[in-house]
Amino acid sequence: MTQITLLTPDDWHLHFRDGDMLQETVPATARLFQRAIVMPNLLPPVTDAKMVTEYRERILAARPAGSTFEPLMTIFLTNNTTEQDIIDAKAAGVVAAKLYPAGATTNSDAAVKALDALFPVFEAMAKHGMLLLVHGEVTESHIDIFDREAMFIERYLARIVAAFPALKVVFEHITTKDAADFVMSAPDNVAATITPQHLLLNRNDLLVGGVRPHNFCLPVLKRSTHQEALRAVIATGSSKFFLGTDSAPHEKHRKESACGCAGCYSAWSALELYAQVFDDLGALDKLEGFASLHGPDFYGLPRNTSTVTLVKEKWTVPSEIILPNGNPIVPFFAGEEVNWKVKNA
């Protein structure tokens, strides 16, 4: 197959950041994706309806002329979140609330430290039809970074899912066989997103031959057996798994430093890279479900009606992109060849 046409996809997990960065990130995503779930981990985090409304306006103002791209907004759960916050956020158009364990990722220090205390909030979310998005890692310093996702499932996620059968839960950016198996065996109210980097790479691509800071993300890349499990699960075409890039921009100097930031900025190449993975797996017929159908179906939103066409044509991801402030950013897969290209995009 040398050409494939899909219903226009959505990105069910990304980071736009704020300020000048929006002039880069919003057009990059709006190029191909009709909607995106926007993460709330700004400084300060987006925790209530007023902050969401203001952030959404800043995103809309950064859309290219004529764009109909729609940001789908989220709020950041803290131990101070109340049922009224959920009600107000829902009224403001928020579709989901994000659970970050404190310290798990960029700008998550304000996040949840006592998970059980949030059970009344989860109850309110189920009642009011708001999804729970989960960064599924424990953060205790004595737990090995490669084991934190599996430990989170065992310690917390299994309990949340069992306690709230009416709550839709998205286990975001899963990285392990443990997570894939958990989602596959869970009830229909549980789904997961998978990033391009966790399908394309494993921890050798981060650490062999030198540290590769632009492949560093959280949750961290795992061993190849976990990568293969993720690839196998998308090849099944299961509706429990859908596209979420976790595209997460950081300026070049913040990645290439003594304490480099976590995140892969994949917006300019994500759909093409997913196509490459599905092609390699002999499962191109499953790409549209993953990219365009399973996400809106799970969220209870209409599928898009426009289409995007990809052709089998080689191109090279740019080595860097200059941000509006003049500083460079290195995109994911920089300088690498990609086998699929969007037609007329």
Curated annotation (Swiss-Prot):
The residues that the entry says bind Zn(2+) 1 are 13, 15, 98, 246
Q: Does the keyword Hydrolase apply?
A: yes
> Entry's NCBIfam families?
pyrC_dimer
The gene coding this protein: pyrC
Please identify the protein, giving its name as recorded. Answer: Dihydroorotase
Q: Which Pfam families match?
A: Amidohydro_1
The record lists substrate as bound by: 15-17, 41, 135, 218, 250, 262
- Species, as recorded: Shewanella halifaxensis (strain HAW-EB4)
GO molecular function term, any single one: zinc ion binding
Q: Which CDD domains match?
A: DHOase
